[in-house]
Amino acid sequence: MEEQVANAIEIASNPSADPALKTQAFDFVNQLRSDPSGWQVCLSLFTQTPQRSGIVRHVALEVVNSAAQGGLIDLQALAYVKDGLLAYLRQVYGQDAGASDPPNIQNKIAQTITFLFSALYASGWESFFDDLLGLTQKSPSSTTRDNASGIIFYLRVINSIHDEIGDVLVSRSRNEQDKANALKDLIRQRDMQKITSSWQQILSEWRDGNDVIVEMCLKAVGSWVSWIDIGLVVNQTMLDLLFQQLGRAQKEDLRQGEEKVRDAAVDVFTEIIGKKMKPEDKIDMIIFLNLDTIVSQLSNSPPLHGNRFTFKYDTDLAETVAKLVNITVIDIVRALEQEGVSTECKEKANGLLQAFLPHILRYFSDEYDEVCSTVIPCVSDLLTYLRRIAKVNPALASQHSSILLPILKAIIAKMRYDETSSWGEEDEQTDEAEFQELRKRLGILQQMIASINEQLYMEVVSEMVATTFENLRQSGSQMDWRDLDLALHEMFLFGDLAVKAGSLYTKGNPNNQAAERLIEMMLRMVESDIRSFTHPATQLQYTEICVRYSSFFHHHTHLIPGVLENFLQLVHHPIKKVKTRSWYLFQRLVKQLRQYVGNVAQTVVEALGDLLVIRAELPSEVSEGDEMSSEDHELADAIFNSQLYLFEAVGIICSTPTISPDKQVLYVQAVLNPIFLDMEKNLEAAKSQDERAILQIHHDIMALGTLARGFSDWMPGTNTPATLPAPEVSAAFNQVAEATLVALESLKSSFNVRTAARFAFSRLIGVLGSRILPQLPRWIDGLLTQTSSRDEMALFLRLLDQVIFGFKGEIFSILDTLLTPFLQRVFSGIADPTTGTDDEIQLAELKREYLNFLLAVLNNDLGAVIISERNQPIFETVISTIEHFSKDIDDFTTAKMAFSVLSKMSSSWGGPDVIAEASNGTPPSQAPLPGFGQFMITRFSPLCWALPSTPSFNSKDAQAKQVLAEAGGLQRTIYAKTGMEYLTYLRDRELPGMGMGGELIEEFVGALSRLDLKGFRQFFPVCLSNFHILSI
């Protein structure tokens, strides 16, 4: 059997084995894992002599582990496994044989031994640590820990046990945690003294003999210290041994591996300080350990001081010491801010804070961002504490200047690009992203300082920015771009203090002192020569700042032409990233300065002309499966989407009130005519399904719609102050609508073209107004095709709601003409089968938009169009769809809307209220529909009971209650319109037909006649819940 198992493992792991045979071998080994007797064979395979191959032994022990952890080995058998493995360990590790197992096998054995510890230490293997410690000596008569291989294995198990029961980062169930806690208690009670004594012996006897042993031992001390008696580690003997290892930091040159030992020694102190204690005890511990001196010595050691700013600088040690500083300062601050801490302790903590401030600054200002990031948490805690103090006593803010000033200066210095950075390089993107993330974290700290001492923050930043611009004036393009970028970045952040409600001004005056300072900075920046901003990073910062503080230009209009000229240079920038970002920012700027840019409209349109040429790009022609093709396509899309901002900017500039309508038409046609020619040129090829031509048409239509969006902010039915453009301009955009419709009618099978056309339609409403109404049938015919998705239909319905709301006085006849064919397409979309979750979501959305459309028609006094002679044939379909939706147990939102539509129909067509205290006190907006009263009673009223009669309906569900409230509102509306006729129907037919008893009927009818609309909406859900009507 053993040979069979060994052969199977060998075959399964052999890459050149026959695939069929390999599959059989895999299956056999996997069956072995679940075989209750499989582990016995594997244990024998692992321990036998001579040793099997490494892979056989590894897999064999893995099977034993799997069986033990899977519960296939009972306690008695686990003792057998323990005896077998212990005998093996004594044979291989206990005699300094010199040929111990490779690390992967050692780790696997340690894993098994750790599991056996968890299962048997409480009962069955009480001598666990004694047995393992026996491996650390060459013979029972040895007086020292002199067996290197045994010591390494012992420490490996010690560290594994911590991972199993002591590591707080490991997620455990409640039972697992209870077991871990019980095992820790047992160790403390039985063996902790001898374990810590063994660490001292090992560190003492091997301090210069074996770096691997010393490092593993230090890691064990550092990990176990969090859950053992601190006195077992913090005692003079152990501290002397730790200080000896720290001494390695003072060496100029370390042999390979010594760095790990030195860093592990520092980590022990970090773990000691990280141990949970009362604030008083922690502060005394920091003082007792003399951590200030330890950190000073480490900071002044050759790797961190002598080698700083050289290639030999030891960043690993710097980060390790920074962790120690960070955890220490966090605890110092905690003692200062915690309630109930004695005054004496706080005085000690304050002294320690002053002592550690230089250490904070040393590592916070480290040139390596990883080191700086390590101490950000303690800086954040310190500033949070100082901010709390300043809020309680603002006078203390100035007293803390000695702490805040150096931190603020360090923050600003760390926000500067370092000398090795290369902005914009492809291979530097990760570094750039990490640096920007660091800037964000530093920016938060800077905001905290500003909230503690605003005056200090303003003075430091103002002085830095002013000095930078003075240096720029003197040295011009010779200035280091990093310094200018830093000043501009600080200007951008400064707005958090200066800008209120999007502006630097309130009623024409600067918001505050910060706004005054920022206005001074803006003057310096804008009056600087843009040619001095030689680096793309500073050029982008310039544009971002101009946009963010555009309110500055409202009060310094004489500077606008120069700034626009600078922007027109940057929108032509050779670097794509700068150019495309500038397109967006240019649009933002002119939108905010619209009233001041009319006099340069012609100049701008001419300057942008070459950038308004549209070139659609298909994904690169590359071999199938090349991953770059999708990236190329995304890049091309991103560039075109950015180009659209230029079209919007042109629309904004050309539509300023200071430009006469004829000039507006002239400028806009200069942009439109090339696009019209391009569409005409590509249309025939697009009809032949040429992909690039279709994409070109899509881009052209999107550009036309975006130009319209820039030209007019006006939307029908909104309260925006904008108005429709002049008639001449609207006439010009009527050509845009016509060109779009011609393309749409020819290419309506293209999803992309329909998408672009729908976008253009929504934007053309704002420039055409009611001129667009006669074209509605053509838009509907093009946008709602046989291939249109439900999502497209829902989006177009939403647009139609807006049109109806905006043009309700002019749309009746057109709506009357198009309603039937339009709704038939919607019904077709609703009826199509769904094939997945996305389809179901789109269907639900289409239903809701359909109901919203009906509500828009009814709410805008256009309900007559639904019952007109032309649309009479679809009236029954409209009603039946609403009835169906009102009974949808799986979509309460739609059901609720369906009842809202039925209520609106009832109030619109049911005639005047015949009951005092009418449904809502408003007269019907439309003439009553003959016979509709009886129709409401017989068709609408039963629907109110249909949904709650469904077996799976839960009347206590929050959404269900809302549906029932809406259904109750419908019943009250029917009663308001029909009075006693409805009550009689309920008494004699509807309620008895449901099996409701006479007493309940009278209570229900009485409530309906007595309560108002609001009252009955509340009553109906309660009625169903209390009377259990569903089961009657």
From Swiss-Prot:
Swiss-Prot/TrEMBL GO biological process terms: tRNA processing; tRNA re-export from nucleus
Protein's cellular compartments: Nucleus; Cytoplasm
Keyword match tRNA-binding: yes
Keywords assigned: Cytoplasm, Nucleus, RNA-binding, Transport, tRNA processing, tRNA-binding
Location (main, coarse): nucleus
A Pfam family that the UniProt record links to this protein: Exportin-T
Superkingdom field: Eukaryota
Sample GO molecular function, one term: small GTPase binding
SUPFAM superfamilies in alphabetical order: ARM repeat
GO CC terms: cytoplasm; nuclear matrix; nuclear pore
Family as reported in the entry's similarity comment: Belongs to the exportin family.
Protein's job: tRNA nucleus export receptor which facilitates tRNA translocation across the nuclear pore complex. Involved in pre-tRNA splicing, probably by affecting the interaction of pre-tRNA with splicing endonuclease.
Protein name: Exportin-T
